[in-house]
Amino acid sequence: MTFSQKDRKETIQETAKTTYDVLIIGGGITGAGVAVQTAAAGMKTVLLEMQDFAEGTSSRSTKLVHGGIRYLKTFDVEVVADTVRERAIVQQIAPHIPKPDPMLLPIYDEPGATFSLFSVKVAMDLYDRLANVTGSKYENYLLTKEEVLAREPQLQAENLVGGGVYLDFRNNDARLVIENIKRAQADGAAMISKAKVVGILHDEQGIINGVEVEDQLTNERFEVHAKVVINTTGPWSDIVRQLDKNDELPPQMRPTKGVHLVVDREKLKVPQPTYFDTGKNDGRMVFVVPRENKTYFGTTDTDYTGDFAHPTVTQEDVDYLLTIVNERFPHAQITLDDIEASWAGLRPLITNNGGSDYNGGGKGKLSDESFEQIVESVKEYLADERQRPVVEKAVKQAQERVEASKVDPSQVSRGSSLERSKDGLLTLAGGKITDYRLMAEGAVKRINELLQESGASFELVDSTTYPVSGGELDAANVEEELAKLADQAQTAGFNEAAATYLAHLYGSNLPQVLNYKTKFEGLDEKESTALNYSLHEEMVLTPVDYLLRRTNHILFMRDTLDDVKAGVVAAMTDFFGWSEEEKAAHVLELNQVIAESDLTALKGGKKDE
């Protein structure tokens, strides 16, 4: 069965006569992760997403699968241990998506510096031990000031004392979501985008037994019934819970906005991802990451109460990031006009004073005494003179000394929670993209327990080894496997660059992609084939779905976007049979998204439509 708009109507009709085991609200990474595991276990599963899959938070991250070294700023050892373990699992189950990309960490001797050269080496050694890369080619190492500047000549030299290099992974966040979605759909789940939940249904005993849905394409409403309903809507979690009049649990979300800006690689040349203090003594850090022929940087971390579906980049966001990056790279002199693209996303944070921070924050700093106690414990642990509980005890004692004052946006917990209301609504919230599988595993175990109470019995899969769509590759030899797939594409007539692009984008699905080889007017064969496959197998419903989330044209391929978008619109018009009015509406939406991304309004101009 294909996965396209042509199957969507039939799927919706099927929901009217089906009682599902599990109904998932939300088609970001959390909901997709739950759906993979429930469908694989044989649970009758339906997922409803009000926008495109991954359109909310899950396509707007920093696009890294973090190992979490930032958590060692407060020596949150347990968080780092969990994070690097999950990162390794994600690399196993989706080997064509996360790619190793060692991170440079320049160290400056200035007020509020996160690390000194000594403390960063201790942190990186502990990080490597937890990530199980000690002794490998990805083992961390220190650089002198001169070595750092030899790598990145544009970096600020003043107060630079050296740097460290440690293992991190780049990620294609939206592709990770769609590959999970496709796996669940292949295993029998009904996956429906542009389907907004507008009401919660209850049985005669007041227990949740379904939802009312509004089709965003037709405005028609329908009901879907299920034994278990789980809310996985990220920042929207409290909003969905408000639809349930019987939900007595207090609100738990405190979304913060993160902004990233994209410039041409020639404007900001960095050979590898770089992570540094802002230099503002505000406890925050900023990433600068090369991608395609571009460089992006971020992020901000500010409380957000606006339109969750359309967070925007403000002048204040731009000024903050440009000030920091231009000070760290003084010869770059990036201006607003240099920004080619941008994105703003919401983090689904749970308000919790005890949480580990993400991007720094002025509160909760360890005292020098506490810091030194932890360092000594870690040194002994790395020398195999102490056991891990000794380190954990030192960390716990230090954390207990940290004053629980007003919570800074950057200190709200990235931890997750799973709660069940009195009438049965499950809500899985919080977490990080790296943790999505682990979060889903905990939720699915609870779902299975609830279904067992009603007499159902399911055997859960081992989700640590269950591959996403496209991920059926040997993770230990992924580059060799992708090279072999690229050879197949070359045999099919694609040049080397196009073949490599398709292999890395689609992984083990490439042979199926090649079955969709075609040539649309205005597009080359590579783009035509990718679009044709996405229309049939990836539930692409609009040009924005394809150009922003199934591919990265809008963010990182601006040089060719104008040439590509007309051909994409024309091909989709033929595929869907759009009228001139429908085509014009899609073109308008596409141009609005592009204008928002390239900050046309802030630049004071208008794009031609």
Swiss-Prot record:
Highest taxon above the source species: Bacteria
Residues bound to FAD: 21-49
Matches recorded under InterPro entries: DAO_C (IPR031656), DAO_C_sf (IPR038299), FAD-dep_OxRdtase (IPR006076), FAD/NAD-bd_sf (IPR036188), G3P_DH_FAD-dep (IPR000447)
UniProt EC number: 1.1.3.21
PROSITE patterns tied to this protein: FAD_G3PDH_1
Subcellular location, record wording: Cytoplasm
GO CC annotations on file: cytoplasm
A GO term for molecular function: glycerol-3-phosphate oxidase activity
Catalytic activities: sn-glycerol 3-phosphate + O2 = dihydroxyacetone phosphate + H2O2
Keyword terms of this UniProt record: Cytoplasm, FAD, Flavoprotein, Glycerol metabolism, Oxidoreductase
Pathway the protein contributes to: Membrane lipid metabolism; glycerophospholipid metabolism
Chief localization: cytoplasm
Biological process according to GO: glycerol metabolic process; glycerol-3-phosphate catabolic process; glycerophospholipid metabolic process
Family the UniProt entry places it in: Belongs to the FAD-dependent glycerol-3-phosphate dehydrogenase family.
Name of the protein in question: Alpha-glycerophosphate oxidase
Organism: Enterococcus casseliflavus (Enterococcus flavescens)
Lineage, broadest ranks: Bacteria, Bacillati, Bacillota, Bacilli, Lactobacillales
Name of the gene this protein is made from: glpO
